[in-house]
């Protein structure tokens, strides 16, 4: 997607007009952000998806390449424009997002069937919900058939995910809002979060990893409930924090890191991303994360 970010003091209420502090354009889209996060962290990543045959589409391909991602599998649609997201960011760095899918609608099952070589090549499949459900389902099915680890970032969250899809997911990574929507349980504390996560595990998900912003991440599976605290930083813009977390998690798991270590690595990467404005422009590189990791070890020594 092409992201249009609007910065303001406070979000407007219904019927209210507020003055903005700035307007920016950056390359974005959840799948592209996740792929760029992997690439900048040293992962060997290839992205599948659809962009328009337009300036924004060409810029997206260039941005992915510059981040170390392989965009050769991307399809450029002659009939639909590159997707667009309008992102509202308040003074605390919190955001609300409206997505116009555009060419993302053409990322369907048939297109993915033509990319089977990449499904066989990879070790981790990272999915998100800005593409049609049929594509998400097919990718998860194919991943399970091939014995791949499937990570699903359920954003933007639908009212319900098919039980079949939940049963194909190794790591479901919602934020608190997405978890509440998918489970039907309004979370007002950790007990509610755990109950909501266990409801989804009861439908077949192996592990639910809830991203909690400045609080870190909560892992819930058949046996474990564990909170991974985040590094405390001054948040500027949370736009791509979840995408960064997912990309870093995938990179770490693909490298063979133990689960605990991989989640801590993802937390550190996301904590760096929120200190900068923008989506792909906010994503850290490997050296930055390792430097912060070293700082953390010194603090705990």
Roles of regions detected by a PLM:
Residues 63-79:
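A glycine-rich helix N-cap at a beta->alpha junction
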Residues 50, 72-77, 87-124, 129:
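Conserved phosphate-binding/catalytic loop of the ribokinase/pfkB sugar-kinase fold
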Residues 39, 144, 254:
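Gly/Ala-rich phosphate-binding loop of Rossmann-like dinucleotide-binding domains
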Residues 159-164, 190-301:
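Conserved phosphate-binding/catalytic region of the ribokinase-like
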């Amino acid at each position: 997607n092409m992201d249009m970010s609007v910065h303001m003091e406070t979000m407007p209420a219904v019927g209210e007009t507020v003055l903005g502090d700035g307007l920016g354009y950056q390359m974005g889209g959840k799948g592209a952000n996740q792929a760029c996060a992997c690439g900048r962290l040293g992962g060997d990543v290839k992205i599948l998806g659809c962009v328009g045959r337009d300036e924004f589409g060409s810029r997206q391909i260039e941005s992915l390449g510059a981040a170390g991602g392989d965009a050769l599998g991307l399809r450029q649609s002659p009939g639909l424009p590159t997707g667009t997201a309008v992102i509202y960011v308040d003074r605390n760095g919190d955001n609300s997002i409206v997505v116009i899918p555009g060419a993302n609608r053409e990322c369907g099952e048939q297109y993915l069937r033509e990319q089977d070589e990449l499904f066989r090549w990879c070790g981790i499949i990272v999915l998100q919900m800005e593409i049609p459900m049929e594509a998400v389902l097919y990718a998860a099915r194919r991943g399970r058939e091939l014995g791949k680890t499937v990570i699903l970032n359920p954003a933007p969250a639908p009212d319900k995910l098919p039980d079949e899809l939940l049963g194909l997911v190794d790591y479901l990574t919602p934020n608190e809002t997405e978890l509440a929507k998918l489970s039907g349980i309004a979370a007002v504390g950790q007990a509610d979060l755990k109950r909501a996560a266990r409801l989804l595990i009861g439908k077949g998900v192996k592990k639910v990893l809830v991203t909690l912003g400045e609080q870190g991440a909560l892992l819930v599976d058949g046996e474990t409930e564990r909170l991974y605290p985040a590094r405390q930083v001054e948040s500027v813009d949370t736009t791509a924090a979840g995408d960064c977390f997912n990309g870093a998690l995938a990179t770490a798991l693909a490298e063979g890191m133990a689960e605990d270590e991989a989640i801590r690595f993802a937390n550190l990467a996301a904590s760096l991303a929120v200190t900068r404005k923008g989506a792909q422009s906010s994503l850290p590189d490997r050296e930055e994360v390792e430097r912060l990791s070293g700082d953390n070890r010194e603090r705990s020594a």
